[in-house]
From Swiss-Prot:
Its EC number is 6.1.1.16. GO terms for biological process: cysteinyl-tRNA aminoacylation. The keyword tRNA processing does not apply. This is Cysteine--tRNA ligase. Monomer. It catalyses: tRNA(Cys) + L-cysteine + ATP = L-cysteinyl-tRNA(Cys) + AMP + diphosphate. The keyword Protein biosynthesis applies. One of its GO terms (molecular function) is ATP binding. The gene is cysS.
Length: 478
């Protein structure tokens, strides 16, 4: 089995072969830190976290770098609105990012470079572009000469003659008169009144958006990397411009593989802050009461390259699915001791191979999840037999292997059982009273084994039963 990934650059699935055997360099375009992350961000970072986890599971050494854009017009506007500094805004939402990602069980990157911490590298790269004739200074600004780079458009498939002027970057009207060509984009912007600025060979100013990532990739990972990832909305102009800047200087491919995740849609439109149709991660988790694992499952149940529709019905389906998976993930904790699981076991090789076959096919997480659900449903069936009939339908050690397989493979997807207390809170009073009634009926029928099984089952969920005179049973949560 060999991992194949869809490469946006070649527009086909390709066998993954890293530059250095056994090691993977991976760069992800991070957030512009001026607001809380929304569901679109969650999708992107869950997808790339899953890619990273899978590469680690395959045995690769992975160096994962993800930047923060902390110099940007949006941050400046927010700082003016709130009467504070750009750094204060950036620091606040950088911290919020870490909090949100931790809740979604996203592994921390190996390095989080910031634009403000990479200014020397940014200026060196601009100077090299200027020396090689790919950049020119104009009244304190510096622009990249798009027509000088012969391969411009190779990632997005766009041709200059089909583009509108200014399409290659974030443009201010004052810039147009300084450009040699309308398609050129800013590498360095001259200082403006009441805006942060840094000294440079071209005068005080700040970097353009695209040059930041090119410099951070080069500084942290080198001239060429294995995989560059981001949202599909970054293919053009951001990633196209990254390629132009980096390859104009080095003469080497910036990345072997370019991977892009699809957008989250609301009512047929991309979820974005500019459209005002976004829902933040915090709103979903805190106000909506959605479990982080349900949100993760929502992302993984769809092909990562395709758009995904955000609806209440889709979330509810994922909620139901997560309840099934979580019941399976908790099976060993509830029943392992009673089933005599003492020896360690390895994962089921056939099921593991099916999981890997799915993931090797361009991260086919829907097919990989099908393996997990097959295991979880079997564990749930066996649990029902244990509760209601007091026996298993099959071999206890094989069931142990299936549970271990489920836990490990779910972990590759970042899906981990939540604490028992979360599950206990979902068992409402009516359900508890129903179990007590079933236990009472079992005792009346002198089926004390069944009565004990129900007591143990509820105890595993944090429910203690207290039998009192007159056949009354009270309960409490522990």
């Amino acid at each position: 089995m060999t991992l194949s990934l869809y490469n946006t650059l070649t527009r086909q699935k390709q066998r993954f072969e890293p530059l250095q055997a056994g090691s993977v360099s991976l760069y992800c375009c991070g957030v512009t830190v001026y607001d809380y992350c929304h569901l679109g961000h969650a999708r992107s970072y869950i997808v790339w976290d899953t890619l990273r986890r899978y590469l680690l599971w395959l045995g690769y050494r992975v160096r994962y770098v993800q930047n923060f854009t902390d110099i940007d017009d949006k941050i400046l506007r927010r700082s003016r609105q709130e009467g504070t500094t750009m750094q204060a805004i950036a620091d606040r939402y950088t911290q919020a990012y870490f909090e949100d990602m931790a809740r979604l069980n996203i592994l921390e990157a190996d390095d989080y470079p910031r634009a403000t911490h990479t200014l020397d590298g940014i200026q060196r790269l601009i100077a090299e572009l200027e020396d090689k004739g790919f950049a020119y200074a104009a009244d304190g600004d510096v622009y990249f000469s798009v027509r000088r780079f012969q391969d411009y458009g190779k990632l997005s498939g766009r041709k200059l003659e089909d583009l509108k002027a200014g399409a290659s970057g974030r443009v201010e009207s004052a810039e147009e008169s300084l450009k040699h060509d309308p398609f050129d984009f800013a590498l360095w912007k001259a200082a403006k009144p009441e805006e942060p600025a840094w000294d440079s060979p071209w005068g005080p100013g700040r970097p353009g958006w695209h040059i930041e990532c090119s410099a951070m990739v080069r500084d942290r990972l080198g001239d060429s990397i294995d995989i560059h990832v981001g949202g599909a909305d970054l293919v053009f102009p951001h990633h196209e411009n990254e390629i132009a800047q980096s390859e104009a200087v080095t003469g080497h491919p910036l990345a072997r593989y370019w991977l892009h995740n699809g957008m989250v849609n609301v009512g047929g439109e991309k979820m974005s802050k500019s459209l005002g149709n976004f829902t933040t991660i915090r709103q979903l988790l805190d106000e909506g009461g959605i479990s982080p694992m349900v949100l993760r499952l929502f992302v993984l149940q769809a092909n990562y390259r395709k758009p995904i529709d955000f609806t209440d019905e889709a979330l509810q389906a994922c909620q139901n699915g997560w309840e099934t998976l979580q019941e399976g993930l908790h099976f060993g904790e509830h029943w392992g001791d009673r089933l005599g699981w003492t020896e360690s076991v390895t994962v089921d090789p056939d099921l593991s191979d099916r999981f890997r076959m799915a993931m090797d096919d361009d991260l086919n997480t829907p097919a990989a999840l099908a393996v997990l659900f097959e295991l979880a449903k079997e564990l749930r069936r066996q649990q029902n037999l244990l509760i209601h009939e007091g026996h298993l339908d099959g071999d206890a050690q094989q069931l142990h292997q299936h549970w271990v397989t489920l836990v490990q493979l779910a972990g590759v997807l970042g899906l981990e059982a939540e604490p028992e207390l979360a599950e206990t809170n979902e068992l409402d009073e009516a359900a508890i009273e129903d179990w007590i009634a079933k236990r009472h009926a079992a005792r009346q029928a002198k089926d004390f084994a069944e009565a004990d099984r129900i007591r143990h089952y509820l105890a595993d969920l944090g429910i203690t039963l207290i039998d009192q005179a007159g056949g009354i049973t009270r309960w409490s949560r522990t």
